[in-house]
A protein has these predicted regions:
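Short secondary-structure junctions
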Residues: 5, 38-47, 166
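Conserved, function-defining micro-sites of small-solute handling proteins
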Residues: 14-16, 39-41, 45, 92
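Acidic, low-complexity intrinsically disordered regions
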Residues: 10, 43, 156-158
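Conserved C-terminal structural/oligomerization subdomain of aldehyde/semialdehyde dehydrogenase
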Residues: 31, 36-37, 51-170
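Flexible, acidic loop-helix segments that line cofactor/substrate-binding pockets
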Residues: 1-29, 46-52, 68-73, 134-135, ...
Length: 170
C-alpha cells in the first residue's frame, strides 16, 4: 500500500510535514546515524521537502541514536527477541517511556507484558500513534510532563475551593 504525503486538509493524505526544520534535521540525523552504523532501512527513508515516508529500521543496536533517544518522526526500529522476557527487558532499557506496542496472537500474554512495560501508553496489536481524546495522554521517565487531556487538564489548571452559604432563617 501507499500512504499519501502532502496537505493534511486533503482526504487522501495520511502524512503531513515534520513540524519544523529543527525536528526534520533530528529525524534525518537519527536515520543517517543508524544507517552509518550498520542498520538497514527496510522501507521508507525517502523525503519530499519536510515530509518523510514511514521508515522501518532493522539491525539497530544500543550504539545508535535512534535506539537511545525519542525521534518523534515516522521512524521505528524492529528488534528481534527470543522470549517475552527479553522483549520486556529491551523495552524497559530506556530512560523514555511515552508509548509502546506489543504485537502477538496471545492476548493474555500481551496483557501481562503491558502491565510490566514502563510506558505511559501500551497498545496491543495497534500502532503507538493511536490516542483517544477522552483518555489522559502522557509518558513515564523522561517522556513528557505527566498527563494531559480530559479531566486531568481541568484538575491541573484549577485550584479548587469549596464555598458554602447558610441563608438566614426568617
Amino acid at each position: 500500500g501507499s500512504l499519501g504525503m502532502g496537505d493534511l486538509r486533503e482526504s487522501n493524505t495520511w502524512l503531513g510535514p515534520i513540524i519544523s526544520d529543527r525536528q526534520r534535521n533530528r529525524v534525518r540525523t537519527h536515520i543517517d546515524d543508524a544507517k552509518n552504523k550498520g542498520a538497514t532501512v527496510e522501507i521508507g527513508g525517502q523525503w519530499q521537502g519536510n515530509r518523510c515516508m514511514p521508515t522501518i529500521l532493522t539491525g539497530v543496536d544500543e550504539s545508535m541514536t535512534v535506539c537511545r533517544q525519542e525521534t518523534f518522526g515516522p521512524v521505528t526500529s524492529v528488534y528481534p527477541v527470543d522470549s517475552p522476557e527479553e522483549a520486556l527487558e529491551k523495552a524497559n532499557d530506556s530512560e523514555f517511556g511515552l508509548s509502546a506496542a506489543v504485537f502477538t496472537q496471545d492476548i493474555d500474554k500481551a496483557l501481562i507484558l503491558a502491565q510490566s512495560i514502563k510506558a505511559g501508553m501500551v497498545h496491543i496489536n495497534a500502532p503507538t500513534i493511536a490516542d483517544e481524546p477522552h483518555v489522559p495522554f502522557g509518558g513515564v521517565g523522561n517522556s513528557g510532563f505527566g498527563r494531559e487531556g480530559t479531566d486531568i487538564d481541568i484538575d491541573t489548571l484549577t485550584e479548587w475551593k469549596w464555598i458554602t452559604v447558610q441563608l438566614p432563617v426568617n
